[in-house]
Amino acid sequence: MIVVAGEALIDLVPSSQSPSGDGPLPALLPRRGGGPYNTALALGRLGSPAAFCSRVSTDTFGEELLRGLRADGVDTSLVQRGTEPTTLAVADISPDGSAGYGFYADGTADRLFTLPAELPAAARAVSFGTCSMVLEPGASAYEALLRRSAQQGIFTALDPNIRAGLIGDPDAYRARFRAWLPHVTLLKLSEEDADWLAGAEGVAAAVKDWLAAGPAAVVLTRGGDGLSVLTPGGAEIAVPGAQVEVADTIGAGDTVNAALLHRLDAHGALSPDTLAALSPYAWRDILGFAARAAAVTCSRPGAQPPYATELVGPE
């Protein structure tokens, strides 16, 4: 089982990219979202045994979030519940399909997550990231779960998925990020997030430092230009992006997270040792699968990751 730990929220996505003339503003369409939520959903759709570990509101949005997971086979028994409202993220879609977000997260249910007693014995990997690693007091509980999972020998994956507007002290966050790395097996991040985290050091030097701190691999995504993996031994393997007409990029990175974990599992590589021993051929297969999965998500509005049947066929 792959456990995904983090927030579930509602994305409010404009029905069109810009208002016309003096007419009304575009309607905002509610869609299920949150980086970890999207990752869990994508794992379920790909056919991986997956569970979601979070705190979700008992309001109507919360019920819909859980219904969506269950419909795609995701175990929700690790979800804590609360009467506080669901976090809202208002999306701003650029002409190229990229998305920015404004968050309404004060006093919401997901940020009151507490450390669970234990994960199921079947848990072989735990994935973390996004707002849940920033917003207290829940962030400290997720961090504790990351550390405990690593100490228990469980494969851990981290996608920082930076939301700069939620980070009050960037330098403090960067220091906290570096403190997580000894407990991370696989670090995946976008090129933009890597640049933000690296600061003046530069991405190339920073990635070397991050690898030296603990991860067995770092995967960098470059949007339509594809993605690459870097390893502590200095290897770099890259694959191109899959060409598609982009509706928007919401959930694309989350789909990559799920596709990486799903395909790593297929290669028997959900452990630090087996991850470090993967061949270039295996990595090209894993990265190529992730690129194709993300392209499907980008081809339709909102975070709608692909089902396994949509990825069958010529590569």
Language-model region placement:
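Glycine-rich phosphate/adenosyl-contacting loop at the front of the ribokinase-like
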Residues: M1-D75
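Conserved beta-alpha-beta core of the PfkB/ribokinase-like small-molecule kinase fold
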Residues: C131-K208, D225-G226
